[in-house]
Curated annotation (Swiss-Prot):
Homotetramer. Residues from neighboring subunits contribute catalytic and substrate-binding residues to each active site. It comes from Schizosaccharomyces pombe (strain 972 / ATCC 24843) (Fission yeast). Keywords: Lyase, Purine biosynthesis. PROSITE patterns: FUMARATE_LYASES. It catalyses: N(6)-(1,2-dicarboxyethyl)-AMP = fumarate + AMP; (2S)-2-[5-amino-1-(5-phospho-beta-D-ribosyl)imidazole-4-carboxamido]succinate = 5-amino-1-(5-phospho-beta-D-ribosyl)imidazole-4-carboxamide + fumarate. InterPro entries: AdenyloSucc_lyase_C (IPR019468), Fumarate_lyase_CS (IPR020557), Fumarate_lyase_fam (IPR000362), Fumarate_lyase_N (IPR022761), L-Aspartase-like (IPR008948), Pur_lyase (IPR004769). The gene is ade8. This is Adenylosuccinate lyase.
Length: 482
């Protein structure tokens, strides 16, 4: 039964996926600790520690998944000892009595806490990467669909030379491809802390193996291998270096900037009524203004993306205050920092995929906006056409300048339509090109190589970048909880 009387994070209740929420759950955390304790015992036994029996290993295996009653036992024990790891060693030992004396043998708390965190970081990246791949894939399809639709370009959020709807989306895709590269790189760089002891010297393990350095080195590698890692950090303090957290979170923050930019562009286009995010049949935009269709999904992306971007200073500060071999300044901070970074990123990817999958454009509105600006943009072409008929460029420029300013006053001071072309048609000076004006105002002639650039980029660059992830691509519909 849900507890309505205490705070619960909206991340799990409203936004993040079930699989990401489960990854950072208490159950997954303790199950991972138990698996690490099992891996350590297996490796130590394999390397000759006779105090670890077959029965101990079998009992550890049989109880590697924690039960609800065991959580209650651990909670009571933690309250008594004020130490979560020791509480769970005690609880695991009750379930596996033959192993109670060898659980955590030679290890320090960071053997389970830090190695588990590294497992979670890598697993979380494994959940994010397919979602980012699908965002890129669907946006690429959308880009190709609208590669030939002219639209106003904007610089300084003022109308500029035309581009196409699809070409604009390639700018978003390119940033997302860089994010994908960064995600994969960060994921593959994550190593394993291994078995390093209280200050990273492996002294306790050297004592266990009676000074056999080779066995200690082999233990480090074997536990890492059993835990799914080939790369073990060669040196650590008590913890793995907190700069690793920075390296993992930085790509998430960078993606947050990408997502914020994309969502902001869509919001601005929604204001112009050119593009719209999905809007459900029963969705309400405002409790007071019944007509409103607010871009709430893109607003949510921006809200959550800002949170992701602002986590980096926290990670930097945490890394900077790790004195010598470690301090505990990091512990409670990272309990929130790491899960929230991934839960928010997961949520943003989920919303972004939902928006892209249902995003629509309104070509007639786009054309209306082009008609309002294109006459001004076409003036250079008109001047060139007149010079081909023998007109003076300087004189033609002056004629266009006067008429443009007149038309501009109509638009700005009277709220009228841009009538520059009508003024040109009513000016005898421009009679030599009357028959050419319609072709000179064909919007498709103002987009340069935008359609070709879009097609080439998607079919070559994007296709090549997504090739290693082909098996991850799906057409699955993405629904939001709210």
């Amino acid at each position: 039964m849900e507890d309505y009387g205490s705070y619960s994070t909206p991340l799990t209740a409203r936004y993040a996926s079930a699989e990401m929420s489960h990854l950072f759950s208490r159950e997954m955390r303790i199950n991972t600790w138990r698996q690490l304790w099992l891996n350590l015992a297996i490796a130590e036994k394999q390397l000759g520690l006779t105090q670890i029996t077959d029965e101990a290993i079998e009992q550890l295996k049989a109880h590697v998944k924690i039960t609800a009653p065991e959580f209650e036992i651990a909670a009571k024990e933690e309250k008594r000892q004020r130490h979560d790891v020791m509480a769970h060693i005690y609880t695991y030992g009750l379930a596996a009595p033959a192993a109670s004396g060898i659980i955590h043998l030679g290890a320090t708390s960071c053997f389970v806490t830090d190695n588990a965190d590294l497992i979670f970081l890598r697993s979380a990246m494994d959940l994010l990467i397919p979602k980012l791949v699908n965002v890129i894939n669907r946006l690429s399809q959308w880009s190709l669909r609208y590669k030939d639709i002219p639209t106003l370009g904007f610089t300084h959020y003022q109308p500029a030379q035309l581009t196409t709807v699809g070409k604009r989306a390639t700018l978003w895709i390119q940033e997302l491809l860089w994010d994908l590269r960064n995600f994969v790189r960060a994921r593959n760089d994550i190593g394993f802390r291994g078995v390093k002891g209280t200050t990273g010297t492996q002294a306790s393990f050297l004592a266990l193996f009676e000074g056999d350095h080779a066995k200690v080195e082999e233990l480090d590698k074997l536990v890492a291998k059993l835990s799914g890692f080939d790369n073990v950090y060669p040196v650590t303090g008590q913890t793995y270096d907190r700069k690793i957290d920075i390296d993992v979170l930085q790509p998430l923050a960078s993606f947050g900037a990408t997502a914020h930019k994309i969502a902001t562009d869509i919001r601005l286009l929604a204001n112009l009524k050119e593009v719209e995010e999905p809007f459900e049949a029963g969705q309400i935009g405002s409790s007071a203004m019944a007509y409103k269709r607010n871009p709430m999904r893109c607003e949510r992306i921006c809200s959550q993306a800002r949170y992701i971007m602002n986590l980096i200073p926290n990670a930097l500060n945490t890394a900077s205050v790790q004195w010598f071999e470690r301090t505990l300044d990091d512990s409670s901070n990272r309990r929130s920092l790491l899960p929230e970074a991934f839960l928010f990123t997961d949520s943003v990817l989920k919303i972004l995929l939902n928006v892209i999958s249902g995003m629509v454009i309104y070509p007639k509105v786009i054309q209306k906006h082009i008609r309002a600006e294109l006459p001004f943009m076409a003036t250079e072409n008109i001047i060139m056409a007149m010079t081909k008929h023998g007109a003076s460029r300087h004189e033609c420029h002056e004629q266009i300048r006067v008429l443009s300013h007149q038309a501009g006053r109509v638009v700005k001071e009277e709220g009228g339509d841009n009538d520059l072309i009508e003024r040109i048609k009513n000016t005898p000076y421009f009679a030599p090109i009357y028959d050419e004006l319609d072709s000179l105002l064909d919007a498709s002639t103002f987009v340069g190589r935008a359609p070709e650039q879009t097609e080439s980029f998607v079919n070559k660059d994007v296709s090549q970048a997504l090739a290693p992830f082909k098996s991850m691509i799906t057409e699955e519909k993405v629904d939001l909880a709210v």
